[in-house]
């Protein structure tokens, strides 16, 4: 293997070739594009005719059937494209296609909350080949996206501030290439698990980086090393804000057995995709869910996921927490620094949104060994029961824990407490919570009190105090 790698690098030292295309410019296979340790195999991108990039326009007026548009201004004017709306351009990755359901599903969620031009980029002619070749085709597709955006600006007077590129996997780096060609003037780029092989550790001109747009955010869901984890996504931070949900490596719900993964509820094809790259695909599923859950993906500033799970990163800072996904651009400090890193937990099924709470329970009653659980009730809904502590329950002691609720309970109105130990005790001990304090991630604190104690498995309701 080492000899093969060395041979490939030496082969890359040969004088490079170049290919040029009308309106797009010239592309070389010299370093840093090829012939390096990170990109040992030399290749030139395919022609636009061979890749056959297509732009599929969905709008609020045509949410189910796309209009095919080109970088011709008259063609765009005759479509449902509206210059008084934001434009979000979704770009798929390796082996994928622009007509895959997830892209149009993302558009449809957008139509639920905004009026928008939603363009799905189909470059399957260049993505369904060897990975090495696809990474080179990225450059041409990025140039074509940039050409479309430049026509919007020059011929339709459209502001690049209103352009948002959303790329998955290799699509993230296509967005980066388009951003470079528009000199960072595009309003926003979102990288959905940017592809790692041939990009991690490469110079900024090769990959997505924070200078490619006015604001760049990224979601990392498959950031384990390619060997041995088969992690397809980058662990390297690439934006102003980088989110690592669930630690960024293993996503909840992706550890099913082979049969259950392939015989998926969405069908054999989707199930097979999930089995092969479940973690990698989670990034666009999280983003799609975030569109209709504007407060359900709060990211917490933290130096590591282990500290986050140890409850060392709550609550949000004075500027609040950024929301991973669609509403990340609402964060006041979004461009104050580069490579800001945030952690959060998500659900494991279709509803991925979670709301984090910190609960402090001060015990009363008798000393026993057991588990204490609480459930939250508010004007937005009710949570399940979550365990706060297990061990020796002593009156006067306080126990703190954080949990992620699948319901945003809103402003809290009451809390219910319960304890159990599953041990037969003829004395029938009673335990209570004299005070329960609940803090939301926005720093809002709610206090509840009770003077009562209850036996095992009996609910105790605490009222505001």
UniProtKB/Swiss-Prot annotation:
Main subcellular location: secreted
Record-linked InterPro entries: AB_hydrolase_fold, Lipase, Lipase_LIPH, Lipase_N, Lipase_panc, PLAT/LH2_dom, PLAT/LH2_dom_sf, TAG_lipase
Gene Ontology terms: biological process: intestinal cholesterol absorption; lipid catabolic process; retinoid metabolic process
Cellular component annotations (GO), alphabetically ordered: extracellular space
Enzyme active site: 169 (nucleophile), 193 (charge relay system), 280 (charge relay system)
Catalytic activity: a triacylglycerol + H2O = a diacylglycerol + a fatty acid + H(+); 1,2,3-tri-(9Z-octadecenoyl)-glycerol + H2O = di-(9Z)-octadecenoylglycerol + (9Z)-octadecenoate + H(+); 1,2,3-tributanoylglycerol + H2O = dibutanoylglycerol + butanoate + H(+); all-trans-retinyl hexadecanoate + H2O = all-trans-retinol + hexadecanoate + H(+)
EC number: 3.1.1.3
UniProt keyword annotations, A-Z: Calcium, Disulfide bond, Hydrolase, Lipid degradation, Lipid metabolism, Metal-binding, Secreted, Signal
Keyword hit for Lipid metabolism: yes
Disulfide bonds listed in the record: 20-26, 107-118, 254-278, 302-313, 316-321, 449-465
Signal peptide: 1-16
Regulation: Inhibited by bile salts, is reactivated by (pro)colipase/CLPS.
Positions bound to Ca(2+): 204, 207, 209, 212
GO MF, any single term: metal ion binding
PROSITE patterns documented for this protein: LIPASE_SER, PLAT
Domain PLAT: 355-465
Tissues expressing the protein: Pancreas.
UniProt subcellular location: Secreted
Description of how the protein assembles with itself and partners: Forms a 1:1 stoichiometric complex with (pro)colipase/CLPS.
Family of the protein in this entry: Belongs to the AB hydrolase superfamily. Lipase family.
Role description: Plays an important role in fat metabolism. It preferentially splits the esters of long-chain fatty acids at positions 1 and 3, producing mainly 2-monoacylglycerol and free fatty acids, and shows considerably higher activity against insoluble emulsified substrates than against soluble ones.
Official protein name in the record: Pancreatic triacylglycerol lipase
Originating organism: Mus musculus
